[in-house]
């Protein structure tokens, strides 16, 4: 499952949450599609782990991620404006020089990345795996 994979990738056990929504449009010939998952956590203990993590970053989002998230390129992705929390970005594109850097996101003809944003006010994570 994608929570277990992301947990291994980002170093925080995200599997303790409950999936409240999941959509996945992957499955085409080239594996293109969007996976969108919302996970609810019982408290903010996950946020405390993110605060100590080197791969999760405090909001606000950098400009590229903010543009992608709030002017979405896909109708499947709908995330509320989040003021307090953390985000995680991992660029899986074959041309990526640094997978944790979003600066080249719009310099390519396709997207292949994992993005998660945690809302501390609702204790929810919104997870996107985007492949084009």
Which residues are covered by each model-predicted region?
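N-terminal export/targeting and maturation segments
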Residues: 1-60
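Functional cores of ribonucleases/endoribonucleases
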Residues: 55-131
């Amino acid at each position: 499952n994608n929570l277990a994979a992301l947990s291994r990738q980002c170093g925080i056990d995200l599997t303790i949450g409950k999936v409240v929504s999941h959509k996945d449009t992957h499955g085409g010939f080239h594996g293109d599609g969007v996976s969108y998952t919302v996970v609810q956590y019982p408290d903010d203990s996950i946020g405390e782990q993110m605060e100590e993590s080197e791969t999760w970053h405090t909001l606000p989002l950098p400009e590229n991620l903010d543009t992608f998230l709030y002017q979405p390129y896909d109708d499947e992705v709908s995330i509320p404006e989040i003021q307090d929390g953390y985000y995680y970005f991992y660029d899986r594109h074959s041309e990526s020089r640094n997978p944790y850097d979003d600066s080249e996101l719009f310099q390519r003809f396709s997207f292949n990345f994992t993005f998660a944003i945690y809302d501390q006010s609702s204790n929810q994570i919104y997870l996107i795996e985007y492949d084009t």
